[in-house]
Amino acid sequence: MANNSGSDSKNTLYCSFCGKSQHEVRKLIAGPTVFICDECVELCMDIIREETKSTGLKSADGVPTPREICKVLDDYVIGQMHAKRVLSVAVHNHYKRLNHSSKNDIELSKSNILLIGPTGCGKTLLAQTLARILDVPFTMADATTLTEAGYVGEDVENIILKLLQASEYNVERAQRGIVYIDEVDKITRKSDNPSITRDVSGEGVQQALLKIMEGTVASVPPQGGRKHPQQEFLQVDTTNILFICGGAFAGLEKIIAQRGKGSGIGFGAEVKDPDSRGVGELFTELEPEDLLKFGLIPEFVGRLPVIATLTDLDEAALVTILTEPKNALVKQYQRLFEIEGVKLTFTADALTAIAKRAIKRKTGARGLRSIMEDILLDTMFELPGLEGVEEVVVNEEAVNSGAKPLLIYTEVTKKKDATAS
């Protein structure tokens, strides 16, 4: 018996990659001198699939074309065509500049981007989608939490630490990443005149951001927190990091309108009432001087040469956001109900009513989820305990009047109820 077991172990074949025996896997494929199991083949396919996905958009010089970038942005962000074109060209030129930096004596300067638009219009989503398209490390920072070095709050260089963490501490990858700084309109100077007292969360933060946005070698403590002399630091060159700043800039439209008031003089001049124009229309007339009046310092405005303005989302755009993108809210909730074995349907009137509520709240696309949660909360609470429900229909009454969505039961359940009665 001992000899038989010994000969069996000699005849057992093993995967040359993971070491599993032929009895532990479904299939073992033989090569000239090696074997590979089905599990290792699947793993290799996954790796190749990921590599293909990340390089699929790359053009001949390794950078997607502006048209390709814009096409992918269209899948996730509804409307905002002008902003998407501006971003696509700026990002394409930025990474083209990196790939061809040593091929000529002409030095191409970096073009950081400023996104201006009302709350919930897609600023953050645009930045996140760009990073995904380009397969580069991406991090977000909230400008309102930042303070000058030495004061209580988050140090500006912590932004670079977050980017390092996103790149798994690969310094080279981090140096080609994208940083999105949100709420940048909240760090404006508190008055038009330079102050004699320290403004550590306003102008002071703008001054601190200038260095890393223009390009400097930042000394970043690997564990974060405040610096001390005994620490080891990671050196990160920020010259090639693309900075995208975003903000709602509430009140900026009034500054633009005020500047435009004096444009119409004489009998033939067309005088347009500023109040009759929407915020988005006024933003298209933005000049750097308007940002200075708003409270950004000249040096900070100078570091953001590319400005993309986004408009308010109208009713039709919000309905499209609810239904069409790959990760549309309606699709997400339909998937949740599908897990329970129930079909979720929204009537056209219901979708329009949801869009109208979001416009009334002035929260843009960001407010759509909270409205959907309000409508479906009771149904999602009760549904797991109900039997025989095959469909839930959300109509206009459920949105506007607070009525419960309609529950449609299977024929079997109806017959049971009829028999019981």
From Swiss-Prot:
Signal peptide: none annotated. GO terms for cellular component: HslUV protease complex. Pfam families: AAA_2, ClpB_D2-small, zf-C4_ClpX. The gene is clpX. GO terms for biological process: cell division; proteolysis involved in protein catabolic process. Coiled coil: none annotated. ATP-dependent specificity component of the Clp protease. It directs the protease to specific substrates. Can perform chaperone functions in the absence of ClpP. Component of the ClpX-ClpP complex. Forms a hexameric ring that, in the presence of ATP, binds to fourteen ClpP subunits assembled into a disk-like structure with a central cavity, resembling the structure of eukaryotic proteasomes. CDD domains: RecA-like_ClpX. InterPro entries: AAA+_ATPase, ATP-dep_Clp_protease_ClpX, ATPase_AAA_core, Clp_ATPase_C, Clp_protease_ATP-bd_su_ClpX, ClpX_bact, P-loop_NTPase, Znf_CppX_C4. The keyword Metal-binding applies. Belongs to the ClpX chaperone family. Zn(2+) binds at residues 15, 18, 37, 40. This is ATP-dependent Clp protease ATP-binding subunit ClpX. Keywords: ATP-binding, Chaperone, Metal-binding, Nucleotide-binding, Zinc. Residues 3-56 form the ClpX-type ZB domain. GO terms for molecular function: ATP binding; ATP hydrolysis activity; ATP-dependent protein folding chaperone; protein dimerization activity; unfolded protein binding; zinc ion binding. ATP binds at residues 118-125. It comes from the Bacteria.
